[in-house]
């Protein structure tokens, strides 16, 4: 039974091929007299053509694999539950962000209070500036943008985190 390598492993292999073939192409660019040599010219030109083709194919594979990996990451992030999405977006401010989101929406992505929507109850203007979405991750990322733009404080929100004593 043959094991199929993961897209990440395949990407690593293709990146190694890109580096190798770029090195070969660079060698012939830096040693162009070799391409015109009566003794080695035909073989050098053939090797340069092969490396150029391999390089183009590997670069295409790298682009395709990166697209696949981005799609996998996107699907994984879209499926995150609210707590995990908030912690992914806010990192070291996770605890504070969870407190604010709990107070604002009880961690419900569909929460609505007038014009205020989502986990962090962002208004229409804030959603226009910082984004919004239907998933917990989209909403958490938008709220994090707002948080950073406000100087990394919670002044835009009605609810504030309770800071633990240091």
For the regions a protein language model found, what residue spans apply to each?
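Intrinsically disordered, low-complexity
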Residues: 1-98, 160-166
């Amino acid at each position: 039974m043959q094991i199929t390598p993961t897209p990440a492993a395949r990407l690593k292999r293709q990146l190694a091929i890109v580096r190798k073939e770029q090195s070969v192409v660079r060698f012939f660019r830096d040693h162009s007299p070799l391409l015109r040599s009566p003794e080695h010219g035909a073989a050098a030109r053939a090797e340069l053509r092969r490396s150029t083709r391999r390089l183009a194919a590997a670069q295409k594979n790298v682009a395709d694999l990166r697209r696949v990996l981005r799609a996998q990451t996107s699907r994984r992030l879209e499926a995150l539950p609210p707590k995990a999405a908030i912690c992914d977006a806010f990192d070291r401010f996770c605890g504070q962000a969870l407190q604010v989101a709990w107070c604002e929406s009880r961690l419900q992505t569909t929460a609505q209070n007038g014009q205020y929507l989502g986990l962090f109850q962002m208004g229409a203007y804030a959603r226009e500036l910082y984004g919004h979405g239907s998933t917990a991750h989209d909403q958490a990322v938008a709220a994090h943008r707002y948080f950073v733009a406000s100087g990394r404080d919670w002044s835009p929100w009605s609810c504030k985190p309770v800071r633990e004593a240091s």
